[in-house]
């Protein structure tokens, strides 16, 4: 079963971007390389159970097992020791990446309260886009009754685009609702 977002990319986005930026080859057209979802769980220093719940929610959202991230160095002000588990992250590529992006754009983002589009200023200068989500409840897989605490996450969409403008047009073509 082919993903509808991947088909849209092949049939609509590639020709549109080729025409707009005058690419000589189809391989020069930017594409989404990977999506990294990161959940920093600061409370995990005192309570390891919160990290387990956050990792389970991340696994539900992404469809694959998250990697537990550890503190690189000790910070006394945060009562943090080097090597203590403080977060979870998932790197999505290929089919799962397109499924997640499709779900994010068509289902999850419209469920955000007072949503007027995602900010256009969140590009990093190399065509990659970073999006912060304040609550995990916008994803349909998360059961509202089982949530112990509202947690946010960072979603980084890494593209092969060379400039922010190319990256913006790529994501706009894939249906990302940018603010006017």
Swiss-Prot record:
Record's keyword terms, sorted: Ribonucleoprotein, Ribosomal protein, RNA-binding, rRNA-binding, tRNA-binding
Gene3D superfamilies documented for this protein: 3.30.1440.10
GO biological process: translation
GO cellular component terms, semicolon-separated: ribonucleoprotein complex; ribosome
Any one GO molecular function term: rRNA binding
InterPro entries cross-referenced by the UniProt entry: Ribosomal_uL5, Ribosomal_uL5_bac-type, Ribosomal_uL5_C, Ribosomal_uL5_CS, Ribosomal_uL5_dom_sf, Ribosomal_uL5_N
Family named by the database record: Belongs to the universal ribosomal protein uL5 family.
Functional summary from the UniProt entry: This is one of the proteins that bind and probably mediate the attachment of the 5S RNA into the large ribosomal subunit, where it forms part of the central protuberance. In the 70S ribosome it contacts protein S13 of the 30S subunit (bridge B1b), connecting the 2 subunits; this bridge is implicated in subunit movement. Contacts the P site tRNA; the 5S rRNA and some of its associated proteins might help stabilize positioning of ribosome-bound tRNAs.
Subunit details: Part of the 50S ribosomal subunit; part of the 5S rRNA/L5/L18/L25 subcomplex. Contacts the 5S rRNA and the P site tRNA. Forms a bridge to the 30S subunit in the 70S ribosome.
Name listed for the protein in its UniProt record: Large ribosomal subunit protein uL5
Species name: Streptococcus thermophilus (strain ATCC BAA-250 / LMG 18311)
Source taxonomy: Bacteria, Bacillati, Bacillota, Bacilli, Lactobacillales
